[in-house]
Structure formats: structure tokens, C-alpha cells
Amino acid sequence: GKNCTEEEVRTAIEQGTLMNYLQQVPVKKDDLFFIKAGTIHAIGAGALVAEIQESSNLTYRLYDYDRVGKDGKKRELHVDKALEVANLSSSAEPRQPLRVLKYRKGVASELLTRCKYFEVYRMLVNTERRQTVHYHADEVAFRVLLCVNGCGTISFEGGNITFYKGDCVFVPADSEVLSIHGQVQFLDVRG
């Protein structure tokens, strides 16, 4: 995007030209973007995302492409509130490069991004039928495992959970050591 003033954004919204101020970034499978809070952003058609964010129950809709809700009316915009917290200065492309992973005993892990609220790791597990990988939970915060490819099984004292692409597993804080096996790629979100 480019630097702009609050008034320029308001005018662009009224005239339907807000997209002229935004930086368009083509996306491809496995891309990672870290978008800081307050950054005006949109997700283009056809993109499937895993959106991990700081704990907040607020989303301000600044522009909505004139879409309508189930009631047939345009959805509510929150222009004033959004502009109070928006960062209107230009920024470099938020794409983060993925690094090459090295496998060790059936698992590879890399830190994808980190901020003061969370860390996101990419983990690849590739085990044979009788081989497992041990997973240690955090002592003070729960973790989220989001399966983004393949399938696997998590074993714990109380049983097993089989998970597939799109499934999410919450691991309570101070959990026992878990065993994971299968051929699976997941995001390990640590709060």
C-alpha cells in the first residue's frame, strides 16, 4: 500500500476506490503472512487461510465490496472505529519466507513467526507404523495443533485421537507427553 491520510481513506470508501490504496500481494500454497494488528487487509477470492491472531473479539469492517447480508441489506461498516486504530502508513510486503526443514527421527519443526502474543511453528511428522514422535505441551499455556495436510494420530494416557486436514486439536497446559504418528503437517500455535 501507500501512505495515506484518514480523509483520503474516507473519500476512497465513499467513492469505492479503497482498493487503489492497498497493496495487492499474489498468494500461493504454503505462503505465510504476518499482518500486524491495525493493518488494513482483505483476503482475496479463492484463498483458504489459517488466521491466527491475538486474543480479541473485535473486527472492524472498513469496506465490504457492496456485499449484502442474509437480510438483503448491505452489511454494517465500522469506518470511524476502524480508522481510530488503523495504521495508514505503507509497509513492506508481509510475506515471510519458509525455510528448508531437516528431519530428525521422523519430525521436523521450524518457527514460522513470533510476536508478543503467540508463536507459530510448522511441524512435519513422517513416521512409520511403529514409530512415534513425542510432543511436550507447555506448562502454563494451552497449544493448538491445526492439521494443514495429511493425517495422524495423537496418543495419550486416555486414548487416541485421529486427525485429518482441517482438524484442530487443543492440548491443555501441563498435559502429559503425547505421542504423534502418521504423515502429517500441522501448525503448532503456542500462546
Walk through the language-model features, giving the residues of each:
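Low-complexity, intrinsically disordered Gly/Pro/Thr-rich segments
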Residues: 163-177
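Active-site region of the double-stranded beta-helix
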Residues: 1-29, 39, 43-151, 155-157, ...
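Generic detector of intrinsically disordered, low-complexity, polar/charged segments
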Residues: 35, 147-149, 179
